[in-house]
Regions:
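Core alpha/beta catalytic barrel or barrel-like domain that forms the active/cofactor pocket
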Residues: 31-34, 70, 117-120, 161-162, ...
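Short, compositionally biased low-complexity segments
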Residues: 79-81, 113-121, 165-170, 193
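Conserved anion/nucleotide-ligand pocket segment
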Residues: 99, 103, 107-147
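Short helix-terminating capping/connector loops at secondary-structure junctions
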Residues: 58-60, 116-119, 226-229
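Active-site histidine-anchored catalytic micro-motif
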Residues: 2-13, 21-111, 231-253, 257, ...
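Metal-dependent C-N hydrolase catalytic cores
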Residues: 1-27, 31-39, 168-171, 176, ...
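Hard-cation-handling environments
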Residues: 130-277
Length: 277
């Protein structure tokens, strides 16, 4: 785990650029990026590939990028692209919708129907992983604010990037992006409206965690009625394989043994143990 190696970065970039060059000429391009890629060569790998693609295709080609909600959206990405959209659900269930909307904005730009202008607000703000669920407050409120801004005349897209908090890069953190139709002042107002509300909720965005001991004790006290509905599930947010961790943490098992909790099942990555089975 860790940054993408220089060798892997150069290979991926060369393949992407080769395909762009071979398949052109282009009226527009859609880039399905994550937005938080970090390599030993480029701390902002997504921004860099956008820049290199722009250099290759020129200023007249409309470039759109659809990003993951955990993107650490950089000013470089916004500067090099004409349109950027971000997933607005966590867990991510609107990937298709956001990609379609990005494609629609790119197509309308090519046709001359709109003139997208973007503004990225990036206050010094980080949302704890425990508070990133978009069905729960305070993220649910921030999404309502963003959607209200999107409904204003002249707005083409307004949304939030939660950021990837485990990346040690300057771009790490929450971002607030707005796209207007040819109005840079409006784009800034839209993005700032969401960013300002997030700043007001900065304490709530930090969330509160439960210790391993407390979680196990609460789970161990589950009633027979509760257990009849299914097992108690504990999520170790510090070893989330969906976020790039190795999945080999034994802290929960150690604490379960210390407390005498029985009937615990945990998935672990341990190649040596697996080889002995």
């Amino acid at each position: 785990m860790g940054p993408i190696s220089v060798e892997a970065t150069e290979y991926l970039f060369s393949e992407i650029l080769r395909l762009v060059a071979e398949q052109g000429p282009w009226d527009g391009l859609l880039l399905p990026l994550h937005g938080a890629a970090v390599s030993d060569k480029y701390l902002d790998a997504d921004g860099e590939i956008c820049a290199q693609i722009r250099d290759l295709v020129g200023e007249d080609v409309v470039i759109g990028a659809s990003l993951d909600m955990h993107a650490n959206v950089s000013q470089k990405i916004v500067e090099e692209c004409d349109v950027v959209t971000i997933y607005q659900t966590n867990p991510h269930i609107d990937t298709y919708e956001q990609a379609v909307h990005c494609a629609d904005l790119v197509l309308r730009t090519i046709r001359g129907e709109i003139n997208p202008v973007m503004y990225l607000a990036d206050p010094p703000l980080l949302v704890n992983i425990l508070s990133q669920g978009t069905s729960d407050e305070p993220m649910a409120e921030l999404l309502r604010v963003a959607q209200a801004q999107w409904k204003k005349p002249g707005a083409l897209w307004v949304g939030i990037g939660e950021g990837y908090p485990y990346a040690d890069v300057p771009e790490m953190g929450m971002t607030f992006l707005a796209i207007s139709d040819g109005d840079p002042v409006l784009a800034k107002e839209l993005a700032d409206a969401v960013a300002n509300r997030a700043w007001e909720l900065r304490v709530e965005l930090q969330g509160s965690s439960t210790s391993v001991r407390d979680a196990l004790e609460r789970a161990n006290k589950a009633s027979a009625e509760q257990l009849a509905k299914g097992p108690v599930v504990l999520f170790d947010v510090g070893d989330n394989v969906g976020a790039g961790t190795p999945g080999d943490s034994t802290y929960v098992l150690h604490e379960a043994r210390a407390l005498g909790v029985r009937g615990v099942t945990q998935a672990l990555r341990d190649a040596d143990v697996a080889a002995q089975c």
